Amino acid sequence: TSACCDKCFCTKSNPPICQCRDVGETCHSACKFCICALSYPAQCHCLDQNTFCYDKCDSDS
């Protein structure tokens, strides 16, 4: 999936430390550290930390 995030949280530090908390069957394409729960369907989230948030995935929000 394309690199996007609907639930991104950042610290108030400078620079900020941001992490996407979206959960889905896969992680986005730019994720380097993806963790998936052993469930069906899989529940995965990306543990990468960045200094920014990706654009939202859901264009309706």
Curated annotation (Swiss-Prot):
Q: Does the keyword Disulfide bond apply?
A: yes
> Which residues, by range, are in coiled-coil regions?
none
Site residues by UniProt (Reactive bond for chymotrypsin): L38, S39
Tell me a GO cellular component: extracellular region
Which SUPFAM superfamilies does its entry note? Bowman-Birk inhibitor, BBI
* Keyword line: Disulfide bond, Protease inhibitor, Serine protease inhibitor
Instruction: Please give one Pfam family short name.
Output: Bowman-Birk_leg
Q: Which residues cross the membrane?
A: none
Q: Does the keyword Signal apply?
A: no
Site residues, Reactive bond for trypsin: K12, S13
- Please report any disulfide bonds recorded for this protein chain, giving both cysteine positions: C4-C57, C5-C20, C8-C53, C10-C18, C27-C34, C31-C46, C36-C44
**Family to which the UniProt record says this protein belongs:** Belongs to the Bowman-Birk serine protease inhibitor family.
Protein name as catalogued:
Bowman-Birk type proteinase inhibitor
Q: Which organism is it from?
A: Erythrina variegata
